[in-house]
Amino acid sequence: MKHLLIVGARGWGREVYAAAIKTQAYLDGEYTVKGFLDSKQDALAGLRGDYPPIICAPEDYEVQPDDIFFIAMGEPKWRKHYAEIIEAKGGHFISIICKSASINKTAIIGEGSFISGWSCISDNVHIGKHAIVHLFCDLGHDVKIGNYGTIEAYSFLGGYAEVGECSTMHVRSTLIRHKKIGNNVEVGSSSVVMRNVKDGLHVFGNPAKIINF
C-alpha cells in the first residue's frame, strides 16, 4: 500500500484531500493519506474538519519507499517549483481523478494531475503532468494541455485546441477549436480566445484581447 503526502495544506490542499479520499483508488485501498507537507505548521488551525497532520516543510521531508505525492499548489509556477523539489528527492507522483469525471479511454493524463468531478475529457486528449482540470470543464477531441496547465471551472476547449506549459484558463473561459495559447499565459474569466496567443501574455474579453497590468 502507498502513502500519499499532499504538498500544500492551504485551501487547494484541503480540497485535494477531500477529493483524494473519495477516489476509487483510495476506496480500493491502494493508498492512505499520510499527511500534508507545508512550511506553515498551523495552516489547519481553527478549521472545521478531520485533517491528517502537517508533517513538515516539503524541503525538509525525507522520501520513504512507499510514499507518493501530490502537489497541491494553485499557482502553476509554485506547482512546478515544488514538483521539482520532490522529484529531486526521488519522489513519485499520483494523479487524482474524481469518479464523476467522464474520460475517454484514448485520453492520456500525465502524473500528478487532477481531474475534477463532472469534467469531460474527449477522444485523444493529452494532458501533461501536474495539470489541473476543474469542475464541469469540457475538453474536446485532440486537445493538448501542457505541463502545469490549469483549466478552471466551466471552461471549454474545442477540438485540437492547445494550452501551453504553466498557462491558466480562468473560470468559464473558452478556447475555440484549432487555436493555441502559449506558455505562461493567463486567460481571464469568461473570455473567448479566437486567435493564437503568444507566450507570457494576459488576455481578457470577448473576443479576448491583450491586457497589461
Task: Label each residue range with its predicted role.
Residues K2-I21:
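Glycine-rich adenosine-cofactor-binding loop
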Residues I6-V7, L37, A72, E152, ...:
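Short hydrophobic segments within beta-strands
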Residues G11-R14, D42, K77-W78, I108, ...:
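Short alpha-helical
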Residues Y17-A19, R48-G49, H81-I85, I127, ...:
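Short amphipathic alpha-helical segments
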Residues T23-G46:
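NAD(P)-binding Rossmann-fold cofactor-contacting core
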